[in-house]
Amino acid sequence: MEAKAIARHIRVTPMKARRVVNLIRGKQANEALAILKFAPQAASEPVFKVLQSAVANARVLADRDSVAFDEGDLFISEAFVDEGPTMKRFQPRAQGRAYRIRKRTSHITVVVATPASEEDR
């Protein structure tokens, strides 16, 4: 069983969000939540929320399909960060010049799954 959660237009640069996502890729869901809870990076908060949402989505899918479900079995099968739209702003500088400020956004996707068979556990 797979469950997915996506957060779009998150106001964190994709490069910084990828650093955090790389920490949790392939780990158990509860272990990844613990890592994100204590990670010092600011991007860990939106990634934490997306992972929580994916786990909740898995719980809803299991209830809907009447499948036996244990949150301890969930692992992160996919996690990636795509670049969202960039807001462009100008910073006034001396002598009529202006510097461009690029406020980047991210789309964060996390997919959690249960192992397909007993050998995968």
UniProtKB/Swiss-Prot annotation:
Keywords for this protein: Ribonucleoprotein, Ribosomal protein, RNA-binding, rRNA-binding
Subunit structure: Part of the 50S ribosomal subunit.
Protein name, entry field: Large ribosomal subunit protein uL22
Alphabetized HAMAP family for the sequence: Ribosomal_uL22_B
Superkingdom assignment: Bacteria
InterPro entries: Ribosomal_uL22, Ribosomal_uL22_bac/chlpt-type, Ribosomal_uL22_bac/org-type, Ribosomal_uL22_CS, Ribosomal_uL22_sf
NCBIfam families named among the record's database cross-references: rplV_bact (TIGR01044)
Molecular function via GO: rRNA binding; structural constituent of ribosome
Keyword RNA-binding recorded: yes
GO biological process: translation
CC per GO annotation: cytosolic large ribosomal subunit
The organism of origin for this protein: Renibacterium salmoninarum (strain ATCC 33209 / DSM 20767 / JCM 11484 / NBRC 15589 / NCIMB 2235)
